[in-house]
């Protein structure tokens, strides 16, 4: 029973209580997608091999249905991302904030996602991960390199009803330290219908 109560608390704190959501976890390889999925599932931190094949986790307790797809981030895996866009409710795009050399590649992939017509109105939560590592990029630096300066929606409860504005925001996090991503999911949940 403790596990059920704990899991309810996690989803409620992330704003996903009583919502059905199909969420894609995307980003380059080694950004932390699988680690985040396992932290959300059972707060387990383990070393992962690179994701070779798409995986999904469907978590259900009471009225909660949360289906997350971890599609891998290496170049071959990115070719199948498009196959999962149908009926997606949100995209969580992870970026390794400590790997500045790959910011241009991360921007290119993000630009491709943002310009895809099948994702036009889908909320995007951008997580700059690994801020626990010294000299990781700041939020402003990451926004700049991803071309998101002045483009994001704004944090907090922003009402976008009746507009054609896509919800998109950057949150910095450390999955291994369990910090930052909760605020991002709370923000994203307000835009999941």
Curated annotation (Swiss-Prot):
GO molecular function, one term: GTP binding
Keywords, ordered alphabetically: Endoplasmic reticulum, ER-Golgi transport, Golgi apparatus, GTP-binding, Nucleotide-binding, Protein transport, Transport
GO cellular component terms, A-Z: COPII vesicle coat; endoplasmic reticulum exit site; Golgi apparatus
Places the protein is found: Endoplasmic reticulum; Golgi apparatus
Main location: endoplasmic reticulum
N-terminal signal peptide: none
SMART domains: ARF (SM00177), SAR (SM00178)
Keyword 4Fe-4S in record: no
One Pfam family it belongs to: Arf
CDD domains: Sar1
Record-listed GTP binding positions: 27-34, 70-73, 129-132
GO biological process: endoplasmic reticulum to Golgi vesicle-mediated transport; intracellular protein transport; membrane organization; regulation of COPII vesicle coating; vesicle organization
Keyword Cell wall biogenesis/degradation: no
Family: Belongs to the small GTPase superfamily. SAR1 family.
Role summary: Involved in transport from the endoplasmic reticulum to the Golgi apparatus.
Protein name, per record: GTP-binding protein SAR2
Organism: Solanum lycopersicum
